[in-house]
Amino acid sequence: RIYREYMPDGYPIVNEQNRTDLMAAYLQSHTTVPVVWRYDVLRSQARQNPERLLYYKTDTHWNSIGALIGLDGIFEALDMQTLSPDAYPVEADGTTTGDMANVAALYASLPAEETYTVPGYAQLFEKDGRAVRVIGDSFSEYYMPYLQARFTNSWREHIDTFTMDVVDHPGCDILILEFNERSLDKLLAILEAF
C-alpha cells in the first residue's frame, strides 16, 4: 500500500483499511502499551521522495531507510531523539536482489536494487545504556544496525524461535514486538499470554 499508485489498474484498492490498521487502532485505544504504526509517515515519505525508495521493488521487505523511519516511531514512543526522515544523510552503498526475484528465479533478468546507508548514524545520538530485546519477523533485521548503534545491548529473536518465558522473564529494559501483517496471528497468540 505504500506504493499503491504503481499497481496495475486491474488491481483495484478494495479496502482503505487493512487488518493491521484495525489492530493498531484497537490496541492504541484499548491498552496502555505504546503501539507504533508508521503507515502514514512511510506513505508520506514515499510520495515526497519517490526517487528514494523505502521498500525494495523485487522484495517483500522495506529497505534500511524504510526500516529507520519505522524504528524512529519506536524511538519517539520511548521519548528518544530522532531526526525528520529528510534530515538523515542517505547514501547508496551497494546492490541486492530481492527475495521475490530470487524465488521466481528472475534475479538474472531483473536489475539489481540499490541498498542504502546512513553514514555516521552511530555518532548522531548518544548511546543509551538500556537493554533492548526484539521479538520480530524478518522486517526487524533491517533496523537492527540502527538499534545496535543507539543501545549498548540489543538482540533480536525471530517470532518462530523465541519461547513464551519472555512473559515472566523478559531479560531486558525494553521489549519490542514487531510483526508485519502476515504474522498478525502470531502476535495475537503472544498477546494472549501477557
Task: Kindly give the residue locations of the regions a language model identified.
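Extracellular glycan-modifying ectodomains
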Residues: 1-194
